[in-house]
Every structure is written in C-alpha cells, then in structure tokens.
Amino acid sequence: VSNQVPGISEAEWEVMNVLWEKEPLTANEVIFSLQEKMDWKPKTIRTLLDRLVKKKVVGVNQNQKLYTFFPLYTQGECQKAEAQTFLKRIYGGTMKSMLVQFIEEEELTEEDMNELRSILNEKPKK
C-alpha cells in the first residue's frame, strides 16, 4: 500500500465507514448496512464498491464463493489525506492560515486556549 491515499467522494466515504466499522463484508452486507441509513439502490452501492476497488482503497478477498470487501487504508490514513487535500485547496497548504481563521472566528474559553497552548508547547519543534 502506497503512502498516497486516493481521493474518496462523499458517497464513497459512506461505504468506507461501513467497512471500517466491521470488515470483511460481502457486497450484500454493505448494501444492507447502507440501506438502513441511505436511500440508495443496491446497484448504486455496488458501483461505489467497484469504484473503491478500482481506486485500490478497498480490497477483495476472492478465496471463497462469496467475495468479501475490506479497507486497504485505515480511517486515520484517509482522514489525514482528506485534511491535507482540504488544506491545499482552501488554505494554500498551510495549517497556520487555517488555524488563525478558526481561532479568530471561534469563541474560545480560557480552558480552550490553555488546552491549545499546551498542545503547541508539547509539539516538537521542526
């Protein structure tokens, strides 16, 4: 598995969330789980699974009669990649400009500010 996590659409995130919760799963198990939350047709969910397999975000176990699907990346790896993409697109790739905007616009309590200071103080300098 390479370090570069492929981009995942919002709909594909829903499929991934099901697989991160419990894997491996058959296509029918993924469909059943998603139909409890989303108003999607089984064909739509199968298409999303196929896309995730093509992107190499989801693997397929073909050792059995039933194919089972499993994530090739952890939820944390995908969240980190998504956050970096967001930072590049919206904030020119710098964490500082995003943090400044959030800090200036948020109502922070003294406790919030102390916690942020503590996190920054514990962070090793580069």
Where are these regions (language model features)?
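Glycine-centered, phosphate/nucleic-acid-interacting loop/turn motifs that mediate DNA/RNA or nucleotide
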Residues: K56
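Short helix-coil junctions and helix-kink-helix linkers
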Residues: F32-W40
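Short helix-capping/hinge SLiMs at alpha-helix to coil transitions
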Residues: L19-P24, E36-K37
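Alpha-helical DNA-recognition elements
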Residues: T47, R51
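Short acidic, hydrophobic short linear motifs in intrinsically disordered regions
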Residues: L25-S33
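Short, cationic-aromatic polyanion-contact patches
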Residues: V5-A11, N63-E82
